[in-house]
Regions:
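Vicinal oxygen chelate
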Residues: 1-7, 29-86, 93-124, 133-138
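A conserved hydrophobic helix/loop-capping motif in glycosyltransferases and polysaccharide synthases
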Residues: 9-11
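Short Gly/charged-rich anion-binding patches and loops
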Residues: 17-18, 93
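Conserved active-site tyrosine of GNAT-family acetyltransferases
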Residues: 18-23, 98, 126
């Protein structure tokens, strides 16, 4: 029986730039940062606990040949490889904080829906990110 999701992955074009964005702009924390030969295992996570980590993967060796890496880089910049959804207790407050931290690529300001308030943005590479303040069940 599966008991929880441990690690999910997203592709980025530069791991250091991604780490800076996710930690210093979004407020996440670095999880693992381990090098093994040419490979760098780098994860981020929501602060405060042993929850699901997000592995920041970069196209290229040793995981991909150059042709595959080139295709992945093109898909990343189109925002076509999936994305992330985070929860917050205060979507509007977080939106203001993100703007103060220099986040500019918002795809949607905080908007109320029947399920709660959410907003959209993209990381520096084009990956879509949704942030949801869930509404009351009813």
């Amino acid at each position: 029986m599966i008991t929880r999701l441990n690690i999910a992955s997203i592709y980025v074009l530069d791991k250091d730039e991604a780490l800076d964005f996710y930690v210093n702009k979004l407020g996440l924390e670095k999880g693992n940062d381990v090098r093994q030969g040419d490979y760098r295992w780098l994860t981020i996570r929501v602060p405060g606990g042993p929850g699901t980590e997000v592995s920041l993967e970069q196209p290229g060796l040793p995981l991909h040949d150059e042709a595959t890496a080139a295709q992945l880089r093109e898909l990343i910049t189109k925002g076509a490889l999936g994305g992330l959804v985070f929860n917050t207790d205060d979507a509007q407050g977080l939106y203001e904080t993100l703007k103060e931290r220099g986040v500019t690529d918002f795809t949607q300001e905080p908007t109320e829906h029947f399920y709660g308030t959410d907003m959209g943005l993209r990381d520096p590479f084009g990956n879509p990110i949704r942030i949801l303040q869930q509404g009351k069940a009813g």
